[in-house]
Amino acid sequence: MSDKLPYKVADIGLAAWGRKALDIAENEMPGLMRMREMYSASKPLKGARIAGCLHMTVETAVLIETLVALGAEVRWSSCNIFSTQDHAAAAIAKAGIPVFAWKGETDEEYLWCIEQTLHFKDGPLNMILDDGGDLTNLIHTKYPQLLSGIRGISEETTTGVHNLYKMMSNGILKVPAINVNDSVTKSKFDNLYGCRESLIDGIKRATDVMIAGKVAVVAGYGDVGKGCAQALRGFGARVIITEIDPINALQAAMEGYEVTTMDEACKEGNIFVTTTGCVDIILGRHFEQMKDDAIVCNIGHFDVEIDVKWLNENAVEKVNIKPQVDRYWLKNGRRIILLAEGRLVNLGCAMGHPSFVMSNSFTNQVMAQIELWTHPDKYPVGVHFLPKKLDEAVAEAHLGKLNVKLTKLTEKQAQYLGMPINGPFKPDHYRY
């Protein structure tokens, strides 16, 4: 059935608007354009049937059309019920690429959309491009008969990578995977600089709140937390960090942030942002101690960090202010403003990361798909990384757009350092 369904989107009439947005984004995504220049003729992904489960945004549309330009067949769903940009989905559908995504899916519709991507006209999927692990998990649990035909998985985000390593340790991962998230040009750019801009965009569009002078609590000080903390401090907030890792906690303290527990911070904060990728970060006892009209949001992948169930069961009243903005009246008389139902605030309430930084991430995705498809012998079942040389190539593809001029090593300097004159310039264990 699924191979006969060309698409399901909110409104195909939005395609012209989506195409204009794609045209602008392409000019901000030099890495993906470089991929097209290098590989459109040779089509290294010819024969690949890629099922993609990743936020259906304008930037993702540029990724999808790059994969198609490189020879792949693609079917797509979003990895979040609120993250689809309907004009982008319409543009992809209009281009003849099967896409099943719209903003505001139910959980049942979300699963249905993923299932529409599993079968192509010439057979089932043979590659996975995932963000968060929902597609990977679905095939391993519900459609294991498809696993033998799948050559590889490329995983976009921290949560999905955790899932892959958990599957590997439990002996249930059956397909080779590349951890795209931990490419330096992904985690140190998308996670940090992307969140530094898109978090504020989401909070401002949702609430119009003045951030200066407020107390902001950021749960987690990984790359995402670092970007969020920088952004909030840049707007004039006093930022408090919560952390479990002593190294990250020390980093936060050395940057001048107060570091304490959520049990303490919940009494002080006006704005709360969870960034951990873990469960049970903000619970009922924290809500009960928050200030009136505290704003609570999440920028981790899943909606498990904030106990939304507690709010729904214990609030006296829930008032929807506008899409993805809800105000809960607690029994103590105070109110809580929850954004995007505890899901990704930057995509639920705004447009996600800017195109330029997503070009870094998605160029890694394209390279990972090419590697897995063309060199399956190099990647046994397990979780792998892209080679350092490719990571550096992703960065170099973006320098011209920023008018960056690289210094070149001389032969003498390269010999002195004991490295190739054209890199790689750092060992794999270097942390940047």
UniProtKB/Swiss-Prot annotation:
Binds 1 NAD(+) per subunit. The modification N-acetylserine is found at residue 2. It comes from Mus musculus. Transmembrane segments: none annotated. PROSITE patterns: ADOHCYASE_1, ADOHCYASE_2. Pathway: Amino-acid biosynthesis; L-homocysteine biosynthesis; L-homocysteine from S-adenosyl-L-homocysteine: step 1/1. GO terms for molecular function: adenosylhomocysteinase activity; copper ion binding; identical protein binding; NAD binding. Its main location: cytoplasm. This is Adenosylhomocysteinase. Its EC number is 3.13.2.1. GO terms for cellular component: cytosol; endoplasmic reticulum; melanosome; nucleus. Homotetramer. Interaction with AHCYL1. Belongs to the adenosylhomocysteinase family. The modification Phosphotyrosine is found at residue 193. Residues 183-350 are annotated as: NAD binding. Substrate binds at residues 57, 131, 156, 186, 190. CDD domains: SAHH (cd00401).
